[in-house]
Regions:
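Conserved alpha-helical substructure of the radical SAM core
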Residues: 123-153
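Auxiliary Fe-S-binding modules of radical SAM enzymes
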Residues: 1-92, 244-253, 258-356
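Glutamine-centric residue-chemistry signal
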Residues: 30, 110, 136-139, 310
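Conserved AdoMet/S-adenosylmethionine-binding subsite of the radical SAM
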Residues: 144-153, 158-316, 320-323
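Canonical Radical SAM [4Fe-4S] cluster-binding loop centered on the CxxxCxxC motif
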Residues: 98-135
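Generic beta-strand structural signal
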Residues: 80, 92, 103-107, 115, ...
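P-loop NTP-binding catalytic core
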Residues: 88-102
């Protein structure tokens, strides 16, 4: 019989499981603390449990491992990148970024991605599978254990589309912010989506307080379609309406992410179109000079051109910043480290969700 993934149980579910094996409910609190506060990787670490109970747990459950196979430390800024191997041999990436206000971790939500964004390394091999809730959590846990640094902020902007792994992602948010676990404030969690419209509306009604970051990347429907196959399924107007719904239901300002690609979406017309889209919305625009990858032809504009683009938008009343580049010397972009360490090289066509 396959062992159950005990780390993916939330607090209430774990209480039910512990009752089902004939143990008292208070044991669930002890076990949950070992898993989600003390970050235990083996049942034998749980020293306030009897040996008999530890053996009983080991027979029915497992703490699925997330093994570090590569660890890069930037020499130019306080950024570290991790390549993790999962129990089935698949590999995922995470990044630790240290700031004055605390430590932020960027995690993956899928093995690969089927969204097919033209400038993104993580889509090149297509989607292998969704990550479980425990695999998302354990990226953070492993980084805390390895570095001894407490994580205060989490961004779900690594490999994968979190709203394409909806149920596991939402459960992850609840468990990450649970008072019985790491208890990270939902307001310190940001999730990026390329714009799966029905799931943005669904997320708006979940009662969460996370920040939604919408991958815009094109100032019009036609430009988005050239960069993001998902735009063949959802019109820009639909995506913006969904973002408005998220703001209306949660009170949380939406961030719009915009990868600046030289000669593609960084011209005067783009400034005008972005102004029209964003000026009357309570939002923030984050400009991201694109990370060049060898499999794609895209180049980022020089810093002067990027600053000019930002300044023109600011003059038009747009709340806009340029994202500071982090980890430029350590395969900092999503998917680069995974491919370097032997992921499948065959490039796959865009999958069903991106088709007309």
């Amino acid at each position: 019989m396959e062992k159950k993934d005990i780390v993916s149980y939330n607090y209430d579910e774990l209480q039910d499981e512990i009752k089902s094996i004939g143990e008292k409910p208070f044991r669930a609190k002890q076990i949950y603390a070992w898993l989600h506060e003390k970050l235990a990787e083996e049942f034998d670490e749980m020293t306030n449990l009897s040996k008999a109970l530890r053996e009983k747990l080991d027979q029915a459950y497992e703490i699925r491992k997330v093994k570090v196979v590569a660890h890069q430390i930037s020499k130019v800024d306080p950024t570290e990148k991790f390549l993790f191997e999962l129990e089935d041999g698949n590999r995922i990436e995470s990044v630790l970024m240290k700031y004055n206000y605390g430590n932020s971790v960027c995690i993956s939500s899928q093995v690969g991605c089927r969204m097919g964004c033209r400038f993104c390394a993580s889509t090149l091999d297509g989607l292998e599978r969704n990550l479980t809730t425990s695999e998302m959590l354990r990226q953070i846990y492993q980084i805390q254990k390895m570095t001894g640094e407490r994580v205060s902020n989490v961004v779900v902007m690594g490999t994968g589309e979190p709203l394409d792994n909806y149920d596991n992602f939402v459960k992850f948010i609840h468990m990450l912010s649970d008072e019985h676990g790491l208890n990270i404030s939902q307001r310190s969690i940001t999730a990026s989506t390329c714009g799966i419209v029905p799931n943005i509306h669904r997320l708006a009604g979940e009662g969460l307080q996370i920040t939604l970051a919408l991958s815009l990347h094109g100032s019009s429907q036609e430009k988005r379609k050239k960069l993001m196959p998902i735009a063949n399924k959802y019109e820009l107007s639909e995506v913006l309406e969904a973002c408005d719904d998220y703001y209306k239901q949660t009170g949380r300002r939406v961030t719009f992410e915009y990868s600046l690609v030289a000669g593609v979406n960084d011209g005067p017309d783009d400034v005008k179109e972005l102004t029209g889209i964003l000026k009357h919305r309570n939002c923030h625009l984050n400009l991201i000079p694109v990370n060049p990858i060898k499999e794609r032809d895209f180049k980022k504009p020089d810093s002067k051109k990027a600053m000019e683009f930002q300044n023109k938008l600011e003059k038009n009343g747009i709340n806009v910043t340029i994202r500071r580049e982090r980890g430029s010397d350590i395969d900092g972009a999503c998917g680069q480290l995974r491919r370097r360490y032997g992921a499948v090289i065959e490039e796959r066509p865009d999958e069903d969700i991106c088709e007309d």
